[in-house]
From Swiss-Prot:
Negative results: shows no effect on Nav1.2/SCN2A and Nav1.8/SCN10A. Shows a weak inhibition of inactivation on Nav1.3/SCN3A, Nav1.4/SCN4A, Nav1.5/SCN5A, and Nav1.7/SCN9A. Belongs to the long (4 C-C) scorpion toxin superfamily. Sodium channel inhibitor family. Alpha subfamily. This is Sodium channel neurotoxin MeuNaTxalpha-5*. Alpha toxins bind voltage-independently at site-3 of sodium channels (Nav) and inhibit the inactivation of the activated channels, thereby blocking neuronal transmission. This toxin inhibits inactivation of Nav1.6/SCN8A (EC(50)=790 nM) and drosophila DmNav1 (EC(50)=280 nM). The toxin (1 uM) does not significantly shift the midpoint of activation at the two channels, but induces a significant depolarizing shift in the V(1/2) of inactivation of the channels. Has antimicrobial activity. Disulfide bonds join 31-84, 35-57, 43-67, 47-69. The keyword Ribosomal protein does not apply. Residues 21-85 form the LCN-type CS-alpha/beta domain. It comes from the Eukaryota. GO terms for molecular function: sodium channel inhibitor activity; toxin activity. InterPro entries: LCN-type_CS_alpha_beta_dom (IPR044062), Scorpion_toxin-like (IPR003614), Scorpion_toxin-like_sf (IPR036574), Scorpion_toxinL (IPR018218), Scorpion_toxinL/defensin (IPR002061).
Length: 87
C-alpha cells in the first residue's frame, strides 16, 4: 500500500500539476478589463494572450461589464472581492 502511494506521488511530481480556472482577469489594483460589446474579440484576445483557452465579454456580470476568461492559468491575477483601487 505504501508503495502505491509513493509511486502515485512520484508520478504526480514528475508530470506536474497544472490547474486553470474560469474568472474575471484583473488589471493591477484589482480592476477588471472592461468591455462593452459582447460580440467583440477584445476579451478573447486579452484572455488568450495571458494563457487562457478563450474569453468573452460578460455583460452586467458581478463586476459590471468585464472580460471573463476560460481556463486561465494560476499565475495570472484574477478579480477578487473587494474594491478596485484605480489611481
Amino acid at each position: 500500500m505504501n508503495y502505491l502511494i509513493l509511486i502515485s506521488f512520484a508520478l504526480l511530481v514528475i508530470t506536474g500539476v497544472e490547474s486553470a480556472r474560469d474568472a474575471y482577469i484583473a488589471k493591477p489594483h484589482n480592476c477588471v478589463y472592461e468591455c462593452f460589446d459582447a460580440f467583440s474579440s477584445y476579451c478573447n484576445g486579452v484572455c488568450t494572450k495571458n494563457g487562457a483557452k478563450s474569453g468573452y465579454c460578460q455583460i452586467l456580470g458581478t463586476y459590471g461589464n468585464g472580460c471573463w476568461c476560460i481556463a486561465l492559468p494560476d499565475n495570472v491575477p484574477i478579480r477578487i472581492p473587494g474594491k478596485c483601487h484605480r489611481r
